[in-house]
Amino acid sequence: VPGPSRAPRAARPRGTLTYDKPPLSLDALVGRLSERGLEIPDSERARRYLRHIGYYRLSPYTIPFQQGGPDHVFRDGTSFDDVLDLYVFDRGLRLLVMDALERVEVAMRAALTDHMSTTYGDPHWYVSATHFRRPNTHDGLLRIVRNTCNERLAGSSDAGQDLLVHRSALEHYLTAYGSPELPPSWLMVETLTIGQLTTTYRNLSRRSDRTAVAGAIGLSAPVLESWFQTYVRVRNVCAHHGRLWNLGLGVYPAIPSTTTISWLQGTDALPDRSRRRIYPVLVSLQSILDSVSSRSSWASRLHALLNDRPPMNLSGMGVPEGWADDGFWSRHLT
């Protein structure tokens, strides 16, 4: 369970150097890789990939294949296809993680609005400050929803003249109803990003409400807060197509201390070296899927993605040897 909150870390100072590196052509970039020892049998093919991926997007995927010195020399026998294969693998991992995040995020939205609306018998419960701990944060929520509504009214109709295109539920509410000003809760939650959704949940004033919402997706309130704080970062990386497989996220999911939350079963199933990698994030996503989508094939698809990867890839992710044998995973793989 997460410990007490810490004060925000002070911003690091800016560097003092002047950036004066000139832009390089595709030919020059391919030449640079070749000079560093990367085997490139087809230069035109390499240029084509660099043109459509970008050298500096692909560059981080070269680092695991380098010898480690400041000159960025590649290990003997490393080919352009080795780097490209790692890039494609990471893309597959991002797509798989986004698939799970979508289900988890949708379930969280539904849990929040269902509990609060029915418990208090008010579809506009979120307008009342009595449900929230911090007035400024609540004001921010209302401002977000109000701005979204105003932007929707200022724009053109979703449907226009096309009978096959239906208006969104939010547009229907805004053009059909004049009061209350803001939409009901089940429309409100759809206007929020996952970060705003998490902030709204954390700002609920009653512990009983936070507990009930978390319980609806198989978690305790402190664990939900920790995991969703991590998901905000992970989703941002995925949405911007960033490197995920060996990225240091800076924030990681709390390890549940209760057996009521689905988690790894083996005592050594999550070594210390794995706790600050992407692996516990994958475990946490499957944990929630156990509650909200128990028939999901996500674990099987993850296994298929990881099954044939070299040890370097699994180590970078924090995935321990024999990971799929743990009962947490194996029940989904039989």
Task: Kindly give the residue locations of the regions a language model identified.
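Long, contiguous internal "core" modules enriched in hydrophobic/ aromatic residues
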Residues: P2-T334
